[in-house]
Structure formats: structure tokens, C-alpha cells
Amino acid sequence: MTALDTDTPTAGRSAPLISPGPVIPPPDFGPLDRAQGWAMTAIITALAAITRFLNLGSPTDAGTPIFDEKHYAPQAWQVLHNDGVEDNPGYGLVVHPPVGKQLIAIGEWLFGYNGLGWRFSGAVCGVIIVMLVTRIARRISRSTLVGAIAGLLIIADGVSFVSSRTALLDVFLVMFAVAAFACLMVDRDQVRERMYHAFLDGRIAETRWGPRLGVRWWRFGAGVLLGLACATKWSGLYFVLFFGVMTLVFDAIARKQYHVPHPWRGMLRRDLGPAAYVFGLIPFAVYLASYAPWFASETAVNRYEVGRSIGPDSILPIPDALRSLWHYTHAAYRFHSNLTNADGNHHPWESKPWTWPMSLRPVLYAIDNQDVPGCGAQSCVKAVMLVGTPAMWFIAVPVLGWALWRTVVRRDWRYGAVLVGYMAGFLPWFADIDRQMYFFYATVMAPFLVLAIALILGDILYKPNQNPERRTLGLLTVCFYVALVITNFAWMYPILTGLPISQTTWNLQIWLPSWR
């Protein structure tokens, strides 16, 4: 043996293995087929516009609004002709923030005080919701085909359809909540892209908390949109809370995936403060800004309560205008909190939240069965009912169960995000089940149900390691289901739009005893 052999540390041993670098997520920050994606989105949006605007001005109640349109259409008209505030002469109090009525007023300004006028803005928002759901599904599934499927499903959803064609506030709440969700999905991808580049630059472990992520404009946009949601209905606050927690969890997981030494503490140190600003201060500022006409008015409801219902002195140096707004807000809250069954408040179409996932107790917005012509039978019926398309809503429980399993067991963030959105519109209502409630509160749940179904269909289409026969079977299954939903929607179309049908057909449309 030579000296060289004995002096070599690796003599007589195999070559050492090189330790691999830490495993990080692949650089996947969104779909890449942008041209195809936008072409598909344009087609789906055009289809949505046709369905939402076709014969939009009908039906009416002898030329007047139907159901709760009787509140919001007149209030929007007052907004239009009273410097942006409601006179509200026919009711004791205006009990919802102003943004929804301000948007309804745009349509009334364009087309006048008629069915088209007071429903126009809602229909525009309904089309935007379809576009947003399409884009969200495409982004989180990384599939333009799945995005198209989601778009078709939301077009054919009875709840989303009817809410887009009536002058209630819920469609505006849905649009702002879904738009905020869309912003947060883009923000999630952007955060991971920034973390990826920080990893390549060696900046991940510069501190125990990981890198700062810079200005996050998509998340800022989500804060603005959530403020508009709260300024439409106070239930928008639930989405502020649920989405705020969701994005912080996303941040912590991203830091963990890119091997930040202390990811959760890093999230608390780096991300919690900016998130509090985006989900706290920004929505509050937007909410206050929506009351600008009220602040500027001399005659708005409760505008000058300091010195009347409120004492002139205050412990904190709060401007009188804000104190008056707080008094007004508290009066509206008192109205809602006292609207309970125990106090004798009942409505023939009220429902409780456990009936909402399967659309077990819909809402009849309008019905006319007296001397109605046009159906070819002796007895005709015209009705508008807010009801979910059964092919989707009747399977809500297994869909949600599957989504929960995918979230908890398979750690599939896509299903988790969709569940957060769904539960934000569902769970908080269980806090006071004695309150008078209606199925139209569940309108905001519909887009997230559609997203969950679209993800499941996408998993059927793109299940890995499938042989050609199983892939073909999966494609046929998805096509059959989408066709079933569209057929179901077409069958129910008359009771969603107020078209005249025979009494026999009406009885066939009402599937469940609880629908009567």
C-alpha cells in the first residue's frame, strides 16, 4: 500500500453521497394558458349575460316591486333623488348600510323606476359573479376546463340566477365576498412566488422569521372589497373574520414549505400586523366612506342625535357625527336582534340554517294564479321562487364531507379555502337560531358550493395514473353530470322567472312538501 493510499481519507470506502437541498414546492404560481383562459371566460360571461338579462323587467307586482324589492327599490329611488340618502317615510328605520341601494340606484338612474331599472345593477353583478367563479376555479385547479365547468354550473344554479334578477341586497354581498376571495387566491400565489425567489436568493434564513413579503396589493384589494361587503350587509363582517384567518394560515404554511426556521412565529411577526391593517382598518374606512352622503346631509335619519337622544358629553373625544352614526347603527342592530320568533315574528317562508345546504325551504318571491293566460291550460300559474338547482344542492352534504376529508386528510388547500368561504356564509347564523331568517341568506354560499363541485369534477377528470378506459369513463361521468345540472335548470326555469305554466306543471315543479 502506498503512502498516497493510506493518507487518503476516503481510501477503501465508497464515494460519499451529496446531501440534497431542502425540498420546496415546485414553481407553480398560476395557470399558464392565458389566451385560452380569457377566451373561455369571455364565452362563459356572454352566456351568463344572456341568462341574467333576458326579460329582466318581468315579473312585477302590477308594475311595482316583488317581495323585499318593495324595500330596496324605493330606497334606491330616494338615494337617487335625495342627495344620496333615504327618506324612508314608509318604514320605521333603514336597517341596512347604503352600498347595495346606491348600486340599485345606478340602474334606476339609467332606466327609470321600473323592473329593468331596479334590477339592472343586480344583473350586472350576477354576470360578474359568474366570471369570478370561472376565474377562481381555473386558478385553484390550474385547469381552464375546470374553470369552464364551474362557470356553467354557476350559470345553471337557481339561487344565483334568481338573486341576479331581483333587486335585493344579497347579490351585491355575494359579488364583493367572491371578488375578495378571488383576490386572496391571487395573493396566495404571489406570496409563494416571492418566497420562491427569496429561497433562490438565499434570503429565507436571514432571520428566524423569514423574509418580508413586501406590499401585497391583491390582499389590499380584498380588504377594500370586504369593506364594501360590510357596507352592503353587516354579514360581510363574517367574511372579514374568516378570510383574515385563512390568509394568515396560508402565510404560515408558505413559510413552513420554504423552510423558514420559525414559520408560525414568522407569520405572527411579519404578517399579522399588515393583515390587521388590511382586514381591520381598511374595511372600517370603506364602511365609513359609504356613509359620506349621510354625513353630508342635514336631514338624514338620526344625523343629528347628539343633544337629542345622545347626551352632549362624551368620555372619548369622538366627533358628534360619528356618535350619531353609532346611535343609528345601534338602532338598526336592535331592530335585527329583536326580530325573533320568540317575540312573535313569523313569516310563512322563513327557514333555519340547517335547511339551507340542501335548499329544503326556499322562498316564494311572487305568485299569481288568478286568471293567468299564456300556458295553454284552463288554470295557469306564474311564480318566482328562490330555490337551488336540486342536481347541485341536494348533494351538498356529501360534497362538503368530501371537501372536509380532502382538507384534513389529504391536506388539499383548495378544498380548505372553498370550505372557509362556504362556512363564512353558513356557520355564524347558528349563533342566534331564534332569529327570523330566510333562505336568501344562503345566496352567498352558492358560489362556494359550485367551486367545491367543480374541484371534485376536476379530480375525476385529472386523476393521476389512470388508464385510458378509466379516463374516458371519468370524462363521460363529468359530461353527464354537467348535462344533468343544465337540464335540471332548464326544467325549473319557469318557476325561476315567472313564466306561465299549468297548475299540473307547477305541482310537478314543487318537488318537496317543504317547498310549498
From Swiss-Prot:
Q: Where is the composition biased (Polar residues)?
A: 1-11
Q: Where are the transmembrane segments?
A: 113-133, 143-163, 166-186, 234-254, 275-295, 384-404, 413-433, 437-457, 473-493
User: What EC identifiers does the entry list?
Assistant: 2.4.1.-
Q: Which UniProt keywords apply?
A: Cell membrane, Glycosyltransferase, Membrane, Transferase, Transmembrane, Transmembrane helix
Note in the entry: DNA conjugation in M.smegmatis is unidirectional with distinct donor and recipient strains; mc(2)155 is a donor strain while MKD8 is a recipient strain. Mutations in a donor strain that alter DNA transfer do not always alter DNA transfer in a recipient strain.
Any coiled-coil regions, as ranges? none
One GO MF annotation is: dolichyl-phosphate-mannose-protein mannosyltransferase activity
Domain of life (superkingdom):
Bacteria
A cellular component term from Gene Ontology for this protein is: plasma membrane
> What family does this chain come from, according to its entry?
Belongs to the glycosyltransferase 39 family.
Query: What pathway annotation does it carry?
Result: Protein modification; protein glycosylation
Membrane topology designation:
Multi-pass membrane protein
Entry function: Protein O-mannosyltransferase that catalyzes the transfer of a single mannose residue from a polyprenol phospho-mannosyl lipidic donor to the hydroxyl group of selected serine and threonine residues in acceptor proteins. Involved in DNA conjugation, in at least the recipient strain.
| Primary location recorded for the protein, binned into one broad class | membrane
Mind telling me which Pfam families this protein's record contains?
PMT, PMT_4TMC
Protein name, UniProt field: Polyprenol-phosphate-mannose--protein mannosyltransferase
- Null allele phenotype: Loss of DNA conjugation when disrupted in recipient strain, strain does not secrete EsxB.
Q: Where in the cell is it found?
A: Cell membrane
**Region labeled Disordered — which residues?**
1-23
